């Protein structure tokens, strides 16, 4: 039996824009992706802290350093620019591996600048 475990999370990200005409997805700054151990085309669960809505989509790699979090296509109807969201990835693991797994958490400020990065249960790495 495999368990679905939190792999990584970008916490308190602010939606910077939306593009209803795009086919779908979420564009995320490449630096944030690297920090959170996320990659292009990876499936994500997004939670909108402003309205409680949850939706799934996939990642498009954004330009490093722009701090963009852009919702595309139908996902752009789920959160507005300025909304605070949580972006999560998950991984399947055997129970033995899952018991010792520590997801990567990246916490950002209101401008999507990384503030802290850590694995759950480890010391925070303060970034600014």
Swiss-Prot record:
Stated name of the protein: Aspartate 1-decarboxylase
Predominant localisation class: cytoplasm
Sequence similarity: Belongs to the PanD family.
InterPro entries on file: Asp_de-COase-like_dom_sf, Asp_decarbox
Reactions the enzyme catalyzes: L-aspartate + H(+) = beta-alanine + CO2
An example Gene Ontology CC term for this record: cytosol
UniProt source species: Chlorobaculum tepidum (strain ATCC 49652 / DSM 12025 / NBRC 103806 / TLS)
CDD domains named among the record's database cross-references: Asp_decarbox (cd06919)
UniProt-annotated location(s): Cytoplasm
Keyword Phosphoprotein tagged: no
Modified residues (Pyruvic acid (Ser)): 25
Pfam families: Asp_decarbox
Active site residues per record: 25, 58
Keywords: Autocatalytic cleavage, Cytoplasm, Decarboxylase, Lyase, Pantothenate biosynthesis, Pyruvate, Schiff base, Zymogen
Cofactor note text: Binds 1 pyruvoyl group covalently per subunit.
Top-level taxon of origin: Bacteria
Biological process (GO), any one: alanine biosynthetic process
